[in-house]
């Protein structure tokens, strides 16, 4: 289902989401960068609304790749949750040509998110010899799409047989929708198994937990962005989790956007942060299952917020948790954590981890 964001709702949404995965410390640089990002997002949404209309604002997110081109008149939207690819244009002249070009580029784009600006209309998508969507989409003959010739033929088929149109009240929107293969999630996950195993061995974090976090955070979308400016497969925030990891590794500053958009670096950083939560921030919790529940919840909402569910005193909170069964800890975190998002997050990650453990 498309995510429609009205400009009037952008600012409060940005503010309410800005604390996610921040932990418990704030710094001036983070606030300054976040305010700048909020302004950028507001301007970006305003540009889209002016062209597409109030109810047609679609912006990239953790599980949605959205790229605008043609002076914001054409967009490609990959919904990694639903497994759909929608190419749309409101171009007044030769809309089919605009759609055809966008279809081909989307099908053949690579997997280097650092080279693509999702917050502009710059046409910076390059055709790759190893398309990111290869194997996740098949053409009308049931074949995967690697080369431009096959992508072009499929685009022509789509325009002839699946072209749709609707009105936004002022202009006509032309679109085609492509369904991804049923196991598209597994296809994407497979791309990163080697990186996950390497990070798992390096930091002592279970592979199934890393995969479950990736699925929940981004649905294995390497282009993942968020309103809190979390980046990449594991949705790492530069100035919070990223900075903590760098400091623990003896590095100064914060990881760059290009660093966090690199899949291997993102997985390494996200896994390192999971290890920090487990071995440093929440090490007072004795039972490994109880601690895992706390770590999962803390990855979303911070370690401090997890402990405060049980007591405002961190040591006392750990002591209370240690008197409880893992089931009681899970029940408490999924019902009493102040953040509804964090309550749901523990359920989602725990469920996903069970599925990866069975494989």
UniProtKB/Swiss-Prot annotation:
Membrane topology: Lipid-anchor
Lipidation (N-palmitoyl cysteine): 17
E.C. designation(s): 4.2.2.n1
Record's keyword annotation contains Membrane: yes
Catalytic activities: Exolytic cleavage of the (1->4)-beta-glycosidic linkage between N-acetylmuramic acid (MurNAc) and N-acetylglucosamine (GlcNAc) residues in peptidoglycan, from either the reducing or the non-reducing ends of the peptidoglycan chains, with concomitant formation of a 1,6-anhydrobond in the MurNAc residue
Any one GO biological process: cell wall macromolecule catabolic process
Domain of life the protein comes from: Bacteria
Record-linked InterPro entries: Lysozyme-like_dom_sf, Murein_transglycosylaseC, Murein_transglycosylaseC_N, Transglyc_AS, Transglycosylase_SLT_dom_1
Gene Ontology, cellular component aspect: cell outer membrane
GO MF annotation list: hydrolase activity, acting on glycosyl bonds; peptidoglycan lytic transglycosylase activity
Protein family per UniProt: Belongs to the transglycosylase Slt family.
HAMAP family in the cross-refs: MltC
Protein name: Membrane-bound lytic murein transglycosylase C
Organism: Shigella sonnei (strain Ss046)
